[in-house]
């Protein structure tokens, strides 16, 4: 049996501001932006450049009970992990584009990592795993 996680839903305040952030600040590719009239919503999917794995489904908070979770889907913990093949290239580009890093780069036993916030305050790891890390054989 072969299975995979296709999308991770990220609750956002507004489709267009989220698309702008992810495509302009993080260089993600807009995979799909389809209006679904029967549900009066959009199906918006983005992914890191060159990625063939899991994508982000940008899901607008449309109900009152969803709105408090914009920017806090993981209770203040790091929510998503953006793996890169060149940490310093991506870190420097992100800083130049105004991405807010809340934890500075650090060399750990598993690789190089820094924590940044997206436009809503969700925490992300930017990381480059060591070549011998078990995930590095699967990632990228």
What residue ranges belong to the model's regions?
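Vicinal oxygen chelate
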Residues: 1, 10, 34, 42-45, ...
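Eukaryotic phosphotyrosine signaling hubs
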Residues: 5-7, 75-79
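Short, charged/polar surface micro-motifs in flexible loops or helix N-caps
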Residues: 49-54, 62-65, 87-88
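Core segments of cupin and vicinal oxygen chelate
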Residues: 2, 9-54
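Helix-adjacent hinge/juxtasegments
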Residues: 60-63, 67-76
């Amino acid at each position: 049996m072969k299975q995979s996680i296709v999308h991770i839903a990220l609750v956002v305040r507004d489709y267009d501001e989220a698309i702008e952030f992810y495509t302009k600040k993080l260089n993600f590719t807009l995979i799909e932006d389809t209006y679904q009239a029967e549900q009066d919503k959009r199906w918006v999917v983005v992914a890191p450049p060159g990625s063939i794995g899991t994508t982000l489904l940008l899901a607008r908070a449309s109900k009152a009970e969803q709105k408090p979770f914009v920017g806090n889907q993981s209770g203040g913990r790091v929510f998503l992990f953006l793996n890169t093949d060149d940490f310093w290239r991506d870190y420097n580009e992100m800083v130049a584009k105004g991405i807010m890093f809340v934890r500075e780069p650090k060399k750990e036993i598993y690789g190089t990592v820094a924590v940044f916030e997206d436009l809503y305050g969700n925490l992300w790891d930017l990381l480059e795993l060591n070549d011998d890390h078990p995930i590095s054989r699967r990632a990228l």
